Swiss-Prot record:
Belongs to the Gram-negative porin family. One of its GO terms (cellular component) is cell outer membrane. Keywords: Cell outer membrane, Ion transport, Membrane, Porin, Signal, Transmembrane, Transmembrane beta strand, Transport. This is Outer membrane protein P2. Its main location: membrane. Forms pores that allow passive diffusion of small molecules across the outer membrane. GO terms for biological process: monoatomic ion transport. Homotrimer.
Length: 361
């Protein structure tokens, strides 16, 4: 009998958590170590910003390590500490993308199984898991342009009802000036970085139905100290993300529709609007082998100004060689057409295809 797609998703894409090694378990305290090493061989013209030509590379693709400590107090109460690091290069010229160890997530949690949990620190927000589209490396959905999916935050999550997750987050500034210059004061939020924000969201995944929605209002520092023209600086983004899907359990098939809308308020300039729709699917081709893909149409426009339309498609196949070893082939193609007043239409294309291997531990 085919596995349900929920089991496939958990088994294939969250294996690092499921297979984490318990290194200490005594008197209500549990400590786990886990992570993955991930490498991809690819041909792409969009690995780096402003890249023009397509190149072949063998590089790091999200390798990370995490440690989680949980202390149970009794009566359903618990405290948890979580730290996750990434291997990231500081230099664009480092083609393998293996570099310094940085902190990706670091937070503490206080919670109760019946009342929910409060999370403090650099963590994922409720917006992170809203959309349903699957990808390993070349995701065509730019959710963070609508609502930030992680950051320095205070968050509350409730999971007391089977299949339902409710959440709210307050984001704080994470990037601040370290040195004094003519245009910067130490301790102030870096220009065009997040100043603060709020998010609320809900997601339901049960009885073969998937439904989710999140709303966020994010404020940015405008960079008013910059000399010259100060207009056009991002001040605030109001965004929403949603998903609706149905799981055909007997067929091993999930079909979904993701969408988003955002309005950006700019300093002394016209506002910008963007939206996208993205139908997608995930299908169990055979045991331990899955096929997935999605299409996206996105439009970005300024009142009586520049307009951009993007069509993008992603397709991939993954196969579990072992419960802790996943290999995949994934490709994506995107075409963006930009129109501006009295200017010739500009067309940009992004093409990527890669073969990846993940080893979890």
């Amino acid at each position: 009998m085919k596995k349900t797609l929920a089991a496939l998703i958990v088994g294939a894409f969250a294996a690092s958590a499921a297979n984490a090694a318990v290194v200490y378990n005594n008197e209500g305290t549990n400590v786990e170590l886990g992570g993955r090493l991930s490498v991809i061989a690819e041909q792409s013209n969009s690995t780096r910003k402003d890249q023009k030509q397509q190149h072949g590379e063998l590089r790091n693709a999200g390798s990370h390590f995490h440690i989680k400590a949980t202390h149970n107090f009794g009566d359903g109460f618990y405290a948890q500490g979580y730290l996750e690091t990434r291997l990231v290069s500081d230099y664009q010229s480092s083609s393998d993308n293996f570099g310094n160890i940085i902190t990706k997530y670091a937070y503490v949690t206080l919670g109760n199984k019946g009342f929910g949990e409060v999370k403090l620190g650099r963590a994922k927000t409720i917006a992170d898991g809203i959309t349903s589209a699957e990808d390993k490396e070349y995701g065509v959905l730019e959710n963070k342009e609508y609502i930030p999916k992680d950051g320095n935050s205070v968050g509350y999550t409730f999971k007391g009802i089977d299949g339902l997750v409710l959440g709210a987050n307050y984001l704080l500034a994470q990037k601040r000036e370290a040195y004094k210059t003519d245009a910067a004061t130490p301790g102030e939020v870096i220009a065009q970085a997040i100043s603060n924000g709020v998010q609320v969201g809900a997601k339901y995944d049960a009885n073969n139905i998937i439904a989710g929605i999140a709303y966020g209002r994010t404020n940015y520092r405008e960079d008013l100290a910059e000399l010259g023209n100060k207009s056009g600086k991002k001040q605030q983004v109001n965004g929403a993300l949603s998903t609706l899907g149905y799981r055909f359990s007997d067929l091993g098939l999930l079909v979904s529709l993701d969408s988003g809308y955002a309005k950006t308020k700019n300093y002394k300039d016209k506002h910008e609007k963007r939206y996208f729709v993205s139908p997608g699917f995930q299908y169990e081709l055979m045991e331990d082998t899955n096929v997935y893909g999605n299409f996206k149409y996105e439009r970005n426009s300024v009142d009586q100004g520049k307009k951009a339309r993007e069509h993008a498609v992603l397709f991939g196949v993954d196969h579990k060689l072992h419960k802790q070893v996943l290999t995949y082939i994934e490709g994506a193609y995107a075409r963006t057409r930009t129109n501006d007043k009295d200017k010739t239409e500009k067309t940009e294309k992004e093409k990527s295809v890669g073969v990846g291997l993940r080893v979890y531990f």
